[in-house]
A protein has these predicted regions:
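A short, polar/charged loop/turn motif at coil->beta-strand junctions and beta-hairpin connectors
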Residues: 48-51, 151
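Extreme N-terminal tail/first-helix region
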Residues: 1-47
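Short, structured beta-strand-loop surface elements
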Residues: 4-10, 14-16, 86-141, 147-151, ...
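Short beta-strand-to-coil "C-cap" segments at the C-terminal boundary of structured domains/repeats
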Residues: 157-164
């Protein structure tokens, strides 16, 4: 999947306007200065936990077939990258996750680094192990899970090219 400098933020129509504005501003910052956008403090949308590492996920709309982008916090252990489809504990999955279910081929940008990837939803013991890591790093994910009856999906991004090591919590 080749890089496209023009991005269309995916979904989020059911999020509050202030949250959508902050996410749009973060998209714009990623376009201008990907290294500056890599670390982001979600307190601007009311989520505690301090600055978190964010990636830009490039995926294809399952209905529109358009190339879409979503900025997401990610979690890293060794060379593994995982994203969480919590959507703040809303009752339905985020659009980007539904798109990945329909077409797992995607691309990832972490700062200035780019790689094609394949998305895979974690299950069983692998999911349980990652859920412990995720909630240790971001306890708010436990609150999100408590708000919804759906099991919050954890998605491993299997990168074609391993991401370089970064400083900070990533």
């Amino acid at each position: 999947m080749s890089e496209d400098p023009h991005h269309i933020p995916a979904g989020g129509d059911d999020l509050p306007a202030a949250v959508r504005r902050e996410i749009a501003a973060h998209h714009a910052l990623y376009a201008r200065s990907p290294e500056a956008a890599h670390m982001w403090d979600p307190i601007v949308i009311g989520v505690p936990g301090g600055p978190v590492p964010c990636l830009l996920l490039h995926h294809v709309g399952r209905k529109s077939a358009q190339r879409l982008n979503s900025i997401l916090q990610y979690y890293r252990h060794d060379d593994d990258i995982v994203i969480v489809a919590s959507k703040g504990g809303l009752p339905h999955h985020p659009v980007w996750y539904l798109n990945l279910l329909a077409e797992p081929a995607c691309a990832v940008q972490i700062g200035a680094f780019h790689s094609d990837a394949v998305a895979r939803t974690l299950a069983g013991a692998e999911r349980a192990s990652w859920w412990q890591r995720v909630t240790a790093e971001q306890p708010v994910q436990l609150e999100y899970q408590a708000r919804t009856t759906r099991e919050i999906p954890l998605i491993k991004l299997e990168l074609r090219t391993p991401a370089p090591r970064r400083s900070g919590p990533a």
